[in-house]
Amino acid sequence: MIFYFSGTGNSEGVARIIADRTCDQAVSIVDKDPSSYSFGEGDRVGFVFPVYAYAAPEMMVEFARRVEVGEAYSFAVCTFSNVTGDALEHLGSFVRIDSGFGVKMPDNYPVLNKILETEESAIQKLKAAEHRINEIIPKIQAREAGVFDTLRGDDPHEKSSKGYPWFNENGRSTKPYWVDEGLCVGCGLCERMCPAHAIELIDGKPIWAKEICSMCMACLNRCPREAIQ
């Protein structure tokens, strides 16, 4: 079984491709009870997630640490746009991981006021990601252990998950979010896909009902009208 956490779809896409090629099942961890899953010798368990602040998202950490991996072969795949930092090691401090891999995907984090992908660069990254996944799958099928193939970055101290507690405390506020009511059509997609259930539709318009969210960027990236700012 392959568990994934995905906001914009990058990690979900990777998880589903791997699951399809390995005759496995891809399962979103959102609203799932980790204690309802247990595995043993001969089983295979995967965790696929995006890199947040050079670490694993809190929702993935809280899920993985409560899953009974047992003697199953356990692997992790993290998706990233720049470098992975020590995201796999971070998750590995909560759950046993036999091998881990990184897959570079298009950037979808507009919070830092930077220019995201052009269509051309996104297509190039997706093609490279397909090749990368094809490299990873045989290693998973062979249950290779001790393989940690990621892109940590030039400065392992700078690209460290040590800053993740700060991100959790200060970087997940919903206060900056707002909706352009001239563009919003009240479709409710943002409310339905928010993994933190932080969005509610009031009078046909989204409001952020929680002070903290996952900062997954699903609402920003998937709004069909680009109404969420």
Predicted regions and their residues:
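FMN-binding flavodoxin-like domain, especially the glycine-rich phosphate-binding loop
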Residues: 2, 6-13, 20-32, 37-49, ...
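Generic structural signal for beta-strand residues in well-ordered domains
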Residues: 38-39, 67, 170, 187, ...
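A short, structure-level motif marking secondary-structure boundaries and short turns
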Residues: 76-77, 174-176, 204
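Generic anion/oxyanion-binding catalytic loop in active/binding sites
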Residues: 122, 173, 202
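A mid-sequence, solvent-exposed acidic-amphipathic segment
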Residues: 154-195
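Iron-sulfur cluster-binding cysteine motifs and their immediate structural context
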Residues: 179, 185-208, 218-229
